[in-house]
Design a protein with these regions (language model features):
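Iron-sulfur (Fe-S) cluster-binding modules
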Residues: 1-59, 64, 68-70, 74-82, ...
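Short, hinge-like loop/turn segments at secondary-structure boundaries
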Residues: 100-104
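Short gly/pro/ser/thr-enriched loop/turn and capping motifs at secondary-structure boundaries
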Residues: 89-94
Length: 270
């Protein structure tokens, strides 16, 4: 009997689910025929048929942003033997976590005609803030090759093989000139987990930290201090780390050290 796979969505843009379709749809032959060895039971992005749980593996895209989301993710956790969060929204709250530095009532009043009807949390949370997660697959969006490795690892019973180094290594591998040293552009590559293939530096752009903080204790204070000494303002560096993975603990702490944590913001609430 094939392992049963389920894919779920919360607050997100669907980009990571499109990568799942890329892998399971065999758009990249080098990834193998994973669709042949996994039984996709729940995937509303790609099909309307829903197979009831329990499931062997659950992939979750998106952040938790409403009280209903909390109850739903708890039920998903109960239904999945292994739970894997995919993408920056699920692993770190996503770009929508920028609201976490403000007051939720201010946002509700600005967006909705009748804010009292809206039930939301004060923060956009990673899935791991509410349930136990077995594995996190980072990225905005995730890399199809890394996803294939994680699913293959589950099927054959081994640990996933993901990069244990920063984006700087990927720049060296592809022969990309360092934008920080050669061009004087503040770049998060030295403190960001590899996985994208250093796409932005290859186009003379700084790394924006799409894959989150490097797993090897990233030294953001040292990096931002270097950029400050070369003319970057604390405000611009605070904005640099306040992007797709802004609510990741390491990036969040460095932002707050540089520019403050937003006086008066709420931390939790319906």
């Amino acid at each position: 009997m094939r392992p049963r796979l389920a894919i779920f969505k919360f607050a997100s843009c669907d980009g990571c689910q499109l990568q799942v379709i890329d892998v399971l749809g065999r758009a990249r032959p080098r990834l193998g025929d994973l669709a042949e060895v996994l039984e996709v039971e729940h995937f509303l992005e790609a099909r309307s048929r829903i197979g009831a749980g329990p499931y062997d593996v659950g992939l979750v895209e998106g952040s938790i942003s409403t009280p209903a989301d909390i109850e739903r993710i708890k039920e998903i956790r109960r239904q999945c033997r292994f739970l894997v969060t995919i993408g920056a929204c699920a692993t770190a709250g996503g770009i929508q976590a920028l609201r976490n530095w403000g007051r939720i009532d201010d946002f509700l009043s600005a967006v909705y005609a009748t804010p009292a009807y809206i039930k939301t949390l004060a923060t956009s949370d990673p899935v791991a803030a509410h349930v136990t997660v077995d594995f996190e697959l980072r990225g905005c969006p995730i890399d199809a090759g890394q996803l294939a490795d994680v699913l293959s690892a589950f099927v054959i019973g081994r640990k996933p093989r993901l990069p244990g180094y920063s984006v700087c290594v990927e720049c060296k591998e592809r022969g990309t000139v360092c934008v920080a040293v050669a061009r004087g552009i503040p770049c998060l590559g030295p403190v960001t987990q590899a996985g994208c293939g250093a796409i932005c530096p290859a186009h003379d752009r700084e790394c924006f930290g799409c894959y989150g903080p490097d797993r090897q204790e990233p030294n953001l204070v040292s990096l931002t201090g270097f950029y400050e000494r070369h003319g970057a303002s604390r405000e611009s560096l605070g904005r640099l780390v306040q992007s797709f993975n802004a609510w990741a603990p390491e990036f969040r702490a460095e932002h707050d050290r540089l520019v403050g944590d937003g006086a008066g913001r709420e931390t939790r609430g319906p």
